[in-house]
Amino acid sequence: MSGYYRYPTINNSKIVFVADDDLWLVELDNPNAIRLTTNLSEVSTPLLSPNGKWIAYVGSEDGNNEVYIMSSEGGPSTRLTYDGSFVSKIAAWNGEDIIFATDLSQPFGRVSNLAKINRKGGPTTLLKYGIS
């Protein structure tokens, strides 16, 4: 597969990346890439969970950039955030929580703070680290 690959994330034998505005998976023992999403909108900054079972990513399927999660085996994505704010990047996993950069509660757009949300859903919690 030739193309322009962006935002690679690696966990053990799995590599997930963005190409053609979708998520793709390659396992080290199988060089064939598998398309995980077929969205009409753009996806970015995927991040595999520490156990390799989940992929958190930024998507704009419903308009705003929001946090989504899906199984690394494929299947449907679940939208986790409904904040209506700009999410720019999935930064890290912390146990069951996904840490991400957002302009939620900022008076000016594109000024980001770190926030977290549980992979099972729930409210977004702003982290008190200042501007990210």
Task: State what each model feature region is.
Residues 1, 9, 32, 53, ...:
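Residue-level detector of functional hotspots within protein domains
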Residues 11, 32, 51, 76, ...:
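Cysteine-rich, disulfide-stabilized extracellular repeat modules
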Residues 18-24, 38-43, 56-68, 76, ...:
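A flexible loop/linker signature enriched in serine peptidases of the S9 family
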